Amino acid sequence: IGQSLVFAILAPLGREVGLREVQITSIIAVSALVFALASPHWGRLSDRVGRRPVMITGLVGYTVGTLIFTSVFYLGLHGVLAGTTLYLVALLARCGQSLIMSGTNPSATAYAADNTSRGERTRTMAKLGTANSMGMILGPAVSGALATFGLLAPLYFAAMLAACAAILVWRQLPLTPEDQLTPRSQLRRLRFTDPRLRLFIVSAVGLFIGFSGIQQTLGFQLQDKLSLTGIATAQMTGAALMVSAAFTFLVQVTVMQRLKLEPGSFVRIGLVSLLCGAATIAGFNDFGTLAVGMAFLGTGLGLCMPAISAGASLAVSTEEQGGAAGLIAACPALGFTVGPVVAGALYQIAPPLAPLFSAAVFYIVLVNLVIATRRQ
């Protein structure tokens, strides 16, 4: 919920304090790079010390980081910070937050892998994805409602939710038994170039380069094409993201639970859906057409990510689950490092170029996956 709140509100909030489109998208991109670099380390640490302490650390880091990030924009709205100073302080705050919160995702994914059989791995990852989808559905809806109280209200709410989640994990999640922990001397450092994981990593990074390019320019597209105010933009962006998340949720509770396909098959079908969505969004002039495009995007994301997580988990040993989860958790962040910056720059040249760039990325990933699968 918290992340989708931020994505829905950041574009209009950034414009409200005088930041340019490239500055706004670069805050996401640079902090995503920090997230990507830190995630594998947190994943390996969860193999050594257990899932619960790493998960709690990530959630507490998200809580504190969000409060600091929100305070920076509060100062910007009241004229205390402005221009380059505001941009640099906001960037630093977001990067610090990303450094710590990146422990949550790999530890949660590894915990799910610890407690499921190989035959049920894809379905289990889909269930974990369903929880993410519920957050993506609720987040934009909550963001739109809270935006009526001001553009900062959704961010304070996100911090409160993360704090509650940290308490819940501390109270309810059991510690990892000592005999299931991997000593430091036995930890194997997985790399992004590991041949067992390479195809999954390339596909996931490409997927999120394209998806983030659309997501992070969506607010600009809506505000400029439909002539919306800042608050109305936040509400409409939230509604569009909610459509996407709703279809992700539906796919994960129906298709992913009933069809027994190989992970690669799910990914190929999902990429076709993502390609259709990006092409539709490139030509929208009303919210109805945009909603259709977002539905395609949500469907594609719902098919791809659980399959990629499951495929990577099945490709490694029990002792490497945390490391593999950390690498896969870094992939969305790596995508967000590239996608928003390139799409933001293209948007300033011509708005339709941003989603067309995403469509081109989805097509390249799909072709690469088909060729690699045939070789195997």
Where are these regions (language model features)?
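Short amphipathic helix-loop junctions that connect adjacent transmembrane helices
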Residues: 8-22, 216-236
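Transmembrane alpha-helices of Major Facilitator/SLC transporters
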Residues: 33-37, 236-259
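Helix-to-loop junctions at the C-terminal end of transmembrane segments
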Residues: 38-51, 250-263, 347
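C-terminal ends and interior cores of transmembrane alpha-helices
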Residues: 60-83, 273-285
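Hydrophobic core of transmembrane alpha-helices in multi-pass small-molecule transporters
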Residues: 78-103, 289-303
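Cytoplasmic helix-loop-helix junction between adjacent transmembrane helices
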Residues: 93-132
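Juxtamembrane intracellular "pre-TM" segments in multi-pass secondary transporters
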Residues: 174-202
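C-terminal transmembrane helical hairpin of 12-TM major facilitator-type secondary transporters
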Residues: 263-308
